[in-house]
Amino acid sequence: MADQLTEEQIAEFKEAGSLFDKDGDGTITTKELGTVMRSVGQNPTEAELQDMINEVDADGNGTIDFPEFLTMMARKMKDTDSEEEILEAFQGFDKDGNGFISAAELRHMMTNLGEKLTDEEVDEMIREADIDGDGQINYEEFVKMMMSK
């Protein structure tokens, strides 16, 4: 799970973690956890915090070490691809703003992201996401594709 985080996210979480690891022993107490998460833009409820701690606090001592913290943050990040973020991503792909991502727009965006794809690979991506079979990806199809990753 933590292997899905970027190096930048890991560095950010390490900084956040060490910020609240007051005694420098490499662990974060349950009380500190909420503060840490809020500092990196997450906003968990008390119940969510408790659930997250219970999931990773293997020895039940109420503290979390850094690898456990990374795993937990990776889970949380995966769950919070907000609709707003997905809409922004869709709009980034939909260059002409017509509400659909064409093969050309997808190819253009993937090239910008450093992915050199063949026409066949682009067509395959469209086919996988194109539920209604019209040859392009609408917003609903894009959301389904993003949520399944």
Curated annotation (Swiss-Prot):
Database matches in Gene3D superfamilies: EF-hand (1.10.238.10)
Pfam families membership: EF-hand_7
Keyword set includes Repeat: yes
Recorded superkingdom: Eukaryota
Residues where Ca(2+) 3 binds: D94, D96, N98, E105
Binding site for Ca(2+) 1: D21, D23, D25, T27, E32
Boundaries of every EF-hand domain copy: 8-43, 44-79, 81-116, 117-149
Binding site for Ca(2+) 2: D57, D59, N61, T63, E68
The keyword Protease is annotated on this UniProt entry: no
GO molecular function, one term: calcium ion binding
Gene Ontology annotations for the cellular component aspect, listed alphabetically: myosin II complex
Keywords: Acetylation, Calcium, Metal-binding, Repeat
SMART domains (UniProt xref): EFh (SM00054)
Entry-annotated residues carrying N-acetylalanine: A2
Binding site for Ca(2+) 4: D130, D132, D134, Q136, E141
CDD domains documented for this protein: EFh
Function: Calmodulin mediates the control of a large number of enzymes, ion channels and other proteins by Ca(2+). Among the enzymes to be stimulated by the calmodulin-Ca(2+) complex are a number of protein kinases and phosphatases.
Note: This protein has four functional calcium-binding sites.
Family the entry assigns: Belongs to the calmodulin family.
Protein name per Swiss-Prot or TrEMBL: Calmodulin
